[in-house]
């Protein structure tokens, strides 16, 4: 599946210059392409869409939107390990929900998300220009314009979730001194809903290699499902019936199903997953950016996986989250047994032969130089021990992997859709038998006993266990009213800290932006 997409993508990058800055609103997109030689077939439109999707490759790397989502939740953190990982305090701030408008992770997330919006705007503008000139058949262009508008709606879903109150920029042909004003979270919600309602019906329902890792009808429905599930947070009123309707279209299509093996979704070659509704098709050569081994593994873990580069020893999970998995849950794995795939690397760590324990002679850990990833973390800062914290092992680290993985990253996965529907049904009626059955599908695959009833804590915990490190946990905590509470290495915080600050550099450059409360 990935080969088809790379062929079209690379063709687009070869034909079209996409090297301009994301912040340059006046760039020329097709200055070397004649309209009478291009946009005559679906393949040519697909090639032109390449830039809209290449922005996504920044999703999973260190310092990205994904990183900020995860580290500001209860399932991941980056402790300061002596002289390592202080980084101006930005990761300590993120985990404590004490965000600073000047922190790089806040600024980089904003630039990443609006860079994606701007690329969609560029392409929409160019397509519409060619249509107005009579150079492109409007009927041929409509589904591709809808694809871009839906992708832009996804960028705005992430923006409204993370930053809350943001500008709505839906045009590319603006003045050089254009300074968009802040819109309320409810206004951004309404914009996303309108874009999806107008665009999703025009998207293809075909699910095969030609639509893999592209926005199709069911991706649009997944975006709607997430938007409506979080409507109470975003606009102050629930929309659970709409969330259920969106999930039903995906479920009843028959195009998706649970993989029998949970970890099939996270293998190096996972592009054939029956669960993937929309994924980022990473590749160690052609589509780099998935840097997880560098981000989470201990320096000596290079010997476990025969990695080409030494990892950075940063990201880890927390004891409370790790212990939320019961023993026997296939997602938890077995401490000290690296031969068994798991969401975590925990316990004794070994060389690639599986027999010789890794040794860290400079270790500051009380249990000596033998490398042991302990769930308990001795300190958030300044001297977290080098081996403290179980590491993120959910995605397969291939033997001799480079810093860039070839695993595709799921943005929307069928298991998530089942849990979205279950939650929406439960919120309408806490005793709903269908909600319980949906959650138990997930638990059965994980090898744990079915629930006999559902509580809010059950739902939140099961979402956490299933969707670990897929960039939804912070949003889930907010929706369940748990984000503000005190937890390990985080004090109790005000509700206004549920969203991130607008970066100081953006406010300095645009007087029409308003800072979020609390900052």
Could you say what each language-model-derived stretch is?
Residues 5, 15-43, 192, 225, ...:
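Bacterial Sec-dependent N-terminal signal peptides
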Residues 21-24, 53, 57, 61, ...:
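Long, intrinsically disordered, low-complexity segments
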Residues 23-89, 189, 197-198, 214-368:
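An aromatic- and glycine-enriched ligand-binding surface/loop that stacks and positions planar moieties
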Residues 145, 152, 224, 231, ...:
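Structural register within alpha-helical repeat arrays
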Residues 158-161, 165-167, 230-237, 427-430:
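Short coil/turn linking the two alpha-helices of tandem helical-hairpin repeats
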């Amino acid at each position: 599946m990935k080969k088809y997409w790379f062929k079209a993508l690379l063709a687009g990058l070869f034909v079209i210059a996409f090297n301009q800055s994301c912040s340059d609103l006046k760039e020329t997109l097709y200055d070397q392409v004649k309209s009478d030689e291009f946009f005559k077939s679906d393949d040519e439109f697909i090639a032109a869409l390449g830039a809209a999707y290449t922005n996504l490759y920044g999703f999973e790397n260190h310092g990205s939107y994904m990183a900020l989502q995860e580290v500001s939740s209860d399932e991941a953190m980056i402790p300061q390990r002596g002289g390592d990982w202080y980084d101006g305090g930005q990761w300590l701030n993120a985990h404590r929900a004490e965000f600073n408008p000047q922190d790089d992770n806040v600024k980089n997330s904003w630039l990443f998300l609006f860079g994606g919006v701007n690329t969609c705007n560029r392409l929409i503008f160019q397509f519409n220009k060619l249509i107005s000139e009579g150079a492109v058949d409007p009927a041929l262009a409509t589904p591709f314009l809808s694809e871009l508008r839906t992708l832009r709606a996804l960028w705005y879903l992430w923006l409204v979730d993370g930053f809350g109150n943001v500008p709505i920029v839906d045009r590319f042909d603006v003045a050089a001194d254009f300074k968009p004003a802040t819109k309320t979270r409810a206004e951004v919600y309404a914009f996303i809903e309108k874009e999806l309602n107008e665009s999703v019906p025009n998207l293809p329902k075909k699910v095969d290699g030609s639509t893999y890792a592209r926005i199709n009808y069911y991706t649009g429905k997944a975006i709607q499902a997430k938007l409506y599930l979080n409507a109470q947070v975003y606009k102050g009123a629930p929309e659970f019936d709409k969330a259920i309707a969106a999930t039903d279209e995906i479920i009843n299509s028959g195009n998706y199903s649970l993989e029998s093996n949970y970890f099939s979704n996270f293998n190096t070659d996972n592009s054939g997953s029956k669960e993937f509704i929309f994924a980022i098709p990473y590749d160690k050569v052609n589509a780099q950016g998935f840097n997880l081994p560098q981000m989470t593994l201990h320096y000596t873990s290079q010997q476990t996986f025969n990695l080409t580069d030494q990892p950075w020893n940063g990201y880890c999970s927390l004891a409370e989250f790790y212990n939320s998995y019961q023993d026997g849950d296939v997602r938890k794995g077995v401490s000290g047994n690296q031969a068994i795939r798991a969401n975590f690397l925990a316990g004794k760590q070994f060389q690639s032969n599986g027999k010789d324990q890794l040794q860290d002679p400079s270790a500051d850990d009380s249990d000596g130089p033998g490398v042991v990833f302990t769930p308990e973390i001795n300190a958030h800062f300044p001297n977290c021990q080098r081996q403290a914290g179980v590491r993120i092992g959910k995605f397969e680290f291939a033997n001799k992997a480079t810093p860039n993985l070839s695993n595709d990253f799921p943005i929307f996965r069928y298991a998530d859709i089942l849990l979205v529907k279950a939650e929406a049904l439960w919120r309408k009626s806490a005793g709903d038998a269908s909600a319980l059955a949906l959650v138990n599908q997930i638990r059965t695959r994980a090898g744990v006993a079915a629930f006999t009833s559902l509580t809010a804590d059950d739902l939140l915990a099961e979402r956490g266990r299933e969707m670990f490190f897929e960039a939804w946990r912070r949003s889930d905590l907010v929706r369940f009213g748990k984000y503000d509470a005190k937890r390990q290495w985080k004090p109790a915080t005000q509700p206004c800290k549920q969203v991130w600050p607008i970066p100081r550099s953006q406010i300095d450059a645009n007087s029409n932006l308003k800072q979020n409360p609390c900052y």
